[in-house]
Amino acid sequence: MRVLVRRCWGPPLAHGARRGRPSPQWRALARLGWEDCRDSRVREKPPWRVLFFGTDQFAREALRALHAARENKEEELIDKLEVVTMPSPSPKGLPVKQYAVQSQLPVYEWPDVGSGEYDVGVVASFGRLLNEALILKFPYGILNVHPSCLPRWRGPAPVIHTVLHGDTVTGVTIMQIRPKRFDVGPILKQETVPVPPKSTAKELEAVLSRLGANMLISVLKNLPESLSNGRQQPMEGATYAPKISAGTSCIKWEEQTSEQIFRLYRAIGNIIPLQTLWMANTIKLLDLVEVNSSVLADPKLTGQALIPGSVIYHKQSQILLVYCKDGWIGVRSVMLKKSLTATDFYNGYLHPWYQKNSQAQPSQCRFQTLRLPTKKKQKKTVAMQQCIE
């Protein structure tokens, strides 16, 4: 009885914790004894039959580890491995599909999950809630490889928010999937690692993907025991990591400090370039650099009153200096119609403007916060344009 309940519904709740009411399917399974439910096809030990759900590079590393385990005939951990991924507009597909095809693994595109029999499911960066009916097809449930120390940073973008908020410690959690909510199931294994100083989200994700892959294999080696020893997530300390929108990339010069801007750059710069507004033109800031003390000592920076967004070209270091809430950031290249170095932007745009406005102050030629329309406004604008046409 106890073994079945833990397999289907997880370990007991901590004292005082609350949980949503189980569905009739879960309650029915809990009322049955293990001997009554045991199927001759359910395996008590490895090798396991695994169905993997994933999409991106983080998930690809977990799939690679599972595939390597299947190929290792001496260890006999996995003898069947199939893959479910999301459709992609790219002909090659997402990284997980590319790896599956290259490795000649059976691959399905969601919502198709095949019709085979499996012992356990594994999810990594899949981005879809899996319903109860699907979860119940797996005797050992579905495991999730999540790149944070749950309950901190539940949701689809934990690594980005780790960097964005300046966390100094993060980690990976192997947990059991629960229906209807993301990242709330019992923790089977959790390990922490320090966040390297000035690490980008992409760099940190690579570190966590390798850690998560190793942890997943460790859990699968002792799967029944890991499930029995799972612990509920604590009630306190839960935070959510929502998807990043284009609006997040718009720098708020009056509100954000240089540290916050650099965190934003390291968190999303490789996905969405940071954006600003200059003379009614949208400019993307491609390469940000910290400003050293010798540059900050320049009289041009200290001898005049400046407001956030003021932009000055520093000839010696060949960077644009932009003033924010508490100081300066450096920009080596921008995108304005095409990619431009700081020198190109100065020669083609800033310098001609100052020639026409010789008495102007830097504050009159400044970067301003770009205000992107909300999705509702965008849809309304498109609808109006269609009516006009």
Curated annotation (Swiss-Prot):
InterPro entries, sorted: Fmt (IPR005794), Formyl_trans_C (IPR005793), Formyl_transf_N (IPR002376), Formyl_transf_N_sf (IPR036477), Formyl_transferase-like_C_sf (IPR011034), Met-tRNA-FMT_N (IPR041711)
This protein's name: Methionyl-tRNA formyltransferase, mitochondrial
Role according to the record: Methionyl-tRNA formyltransferase that formylates methionyl-tRNA in mitochondria and is crucial for translation initiation.
Species for this entry: Homo sapiens (Human)
EC number: 2.1.2.9
Pfam families according to UniProt: Formyl_trans_C, Formyl_trans_N
GO BP, sorted A to Z: conversion of methionyl-tRNA to N-formyl-methionyl-tRNA
Effect on the protein of changing residue 209 to L: In COXPD15 and MC1DN27; decreased methionyl-tRNA formyltransferase activity
Free-text comment on this protein's domains from its UniProt entry: Composed of an N- and a C-terminal domain. The N-terminal domain carries the tetrahydrofolate (THF)-binding site and the C-terminal domain is presumably involved in positioning the Met-tRNA substrate for the formylation reaction.
